[in-house]
């Protein structure tokens, strides 16, 4: 009886559970106003013509990032923190806060306009975002950043350029009050595999070592800078090197910096056995942000509540960002489903 009473006394209220959550712009990216760019990073042209995207715009209207703080208050009761996707920053009608760049992926190149937070008009826009946050009573918590590239690239100049972009964004995160910022590890989307051409025919993978070494050096530099501005740099299991939780652990252990940690994602894995084993491997490295994701690619193998329990059993005390990827609901409905599941598990 005493144990039961103690358990009841320690149970979180619904308000306290909501405080452990963060809304997320990524699930509703389709209704954000954005420049139509051929070959854009998230398939904008295709998404805008899809039935789901059209239905979402009719149901929820179109948004900009400046609208999202109030959108959070309106659709996610009690949630006061936000996870913001870098590709949705800026006023798409004002080219002066964007830079044009050419991006190569899987043998294809395309041109994109990317928000440059160091530009004068961009900094003013960030001030507007801060004002909107204050008005709505919400906070930027995490920025899921796709802008810094080439972090583990074999080309030194490309790697330096990626780090420079990351530092600009760390300044921006400090300006808007975000605590953490994801940076992709870069390198090939599919990591090089071992070969048996070495001594004795035993598999050896020298190629991946170079990418890992470059990633360690880059994240050390970014973490040092993040420490100066008060923003942690995080690694998410996303693709490339970071698709393997062991690689993430290697990088974080080698960097060994209080401003460099993991942002585990419930679903960004290459096979189903990593859904929980991979998550458990990253839990000790996560302190601030985790992506509580639903993605129908895993079918019945995925259990959101079980994933939350893995994090809690590992001592995680940070925020759960509601990142719905794909499934039977639209982006807002999916995020609300995640909100219900995560709160039930807390």
Residue ranges and their predicted role:
Residues 138, 231, 314-318:
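A short helix->loop->beta-strand "cap" motif at the edges of active sites that frequently abuts
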Residues 184-203, 242:
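Active-site-proximal loop/short-helix segments
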């Amino acid at each position: 009886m005493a144990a039961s009473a103690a358990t009841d006394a320690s149970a979180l209220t619904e308000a306290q559970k909501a405080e452990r959550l963060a809304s997320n712009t990524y699930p509703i990216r389709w209704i954000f106003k954005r420049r139509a760019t051929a070959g854009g990073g998230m398939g904008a042209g295709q998404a805008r013509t899809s039935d789901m995207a059209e239905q979402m715009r009719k149901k929820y209207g179109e948004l900009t990032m400046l609208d999202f703080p109030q959108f959070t208050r309106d659709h996610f009761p009690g949630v006061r923190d936000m996870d913001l996707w870098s590709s949705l920053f800026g006023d798409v009608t004002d080219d002066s806060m964007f830079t044009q760049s050419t991006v190569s992926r899987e043998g294809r190149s395309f041109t994109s306009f990317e928000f440059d937070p160091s530009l004068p008009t961009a900094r003013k826009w960030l001030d507007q975002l801060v004002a909107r946050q204050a008005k709505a009573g919400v906070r930027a918590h995490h920025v899921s950043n796709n802008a810094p590239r080439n972090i583990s690239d074999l080309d030194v100049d490309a790697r330096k350029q990626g780090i420079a972009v990351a530092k600009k964004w760390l300044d921006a995160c400090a300006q808007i009050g975000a605590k953490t910022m994801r940076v992709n590890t870069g390198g090939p989307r599919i990591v090089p595999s071992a070969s048996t051409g070495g001594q004795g025919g035993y598999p050896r993978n020298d190629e991946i070592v170079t990418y890992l070494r470059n990633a360690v050096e880059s994240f050390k530099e970014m973490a040092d800078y993040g420490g100066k501005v008060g923003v942690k740099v995080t690694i998410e299991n996303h693709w490339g090197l970071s698709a393997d939780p062991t690689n993430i652990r290697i990088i974080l252990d080698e960097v060994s910096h209080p401003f460099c940690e993991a942002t585990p994602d419930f679903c960004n894995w290459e096979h189903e056995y990593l859904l929980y084993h991979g998550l458990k491997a990253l839990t000790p490295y996560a302190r601030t942000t985790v992506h509580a994701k639903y993605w129908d690619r895993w079918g019945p193998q995925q259990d959101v509540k079980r994933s939350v329990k893995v994090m809690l059993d590992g001592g995680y005390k940070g925020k759960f960002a509601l990142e719905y990827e794909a499934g039977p609901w639209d982006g807002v409905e999916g995020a609300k489903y995640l909100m219900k599941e995560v709160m039930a598990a807390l």
